[in-house]
Amino acid sequence: RGKRAEAENHLNDILQSLIFERTEKGKDPYWNDTAGQLARGISKLILMMEERLSIKSILDWRHAKMQSGMLQNCFLALSTDSDIYQDLAGFMNLTAENTKTCIASTFDQLTGLFKASKALTEMMSGTTFSMEKIGKERTAIFLVVPDEKTTYHFLAELFISQCYESLLDQADACKGELPVRVNFILEEFC
C-alpha cells in the first residue's frame, strides 16, 4: 500500500508538469484539468492492467485503444467508486461530443510533442540508468536543452524535480544523509 501511494504521488508530480501546469495565462483551466484527469485515469488503468507505464503506452491507450472501444469497455467494467473510474468519468461520461472532442484535442495538444517525435517518445519510455544510483555512487548527468528554444524546458524541470524527489526518498532511507554528496549545476537555466 505504501509503495502504491508513493507511486501515485510520483505520477501526480509528472502529470502536474506535463499537463496541469501548462495552462496558458488567461485561458480556462477546465480543458487542461479534464485532459489531465483523463491522462491520470489512463495511467492508473495501465498500471491496473499490469502493463508498463510510459508516454508511449499512454499515447497508445489515448489513440488506438480509445478508438477501438477498449478504453470504453474497461471504463464500464470499473466500479463507480474506484479512483480510476473517477479520473476517467469527467471525460468518458460526457454526452456533448463537441466538449469531448475539445478535451481530446487539448490532451493531444499537450502530448503532441511526444506524438510528433518518435525519438523523444522512445527516450521517455525507458531509461539507461537508475535514479537511485545518483545519491549512492559518483555520477555525472549532462542534460542539454537548447536555451534559445523553450519547447523542451518543461522536460528539464521534470527531470530535476524527479531526481530531487528520488534523492529525498534515499536520504530518508539513509537516516537523513546521502552516501555521496550531490551537486546540481544549472547553467543558463530558465
Task: Give, region by region, the residue ranges found by the protein language model.
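P-loop NTPase motor domains
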Residues: 1-190
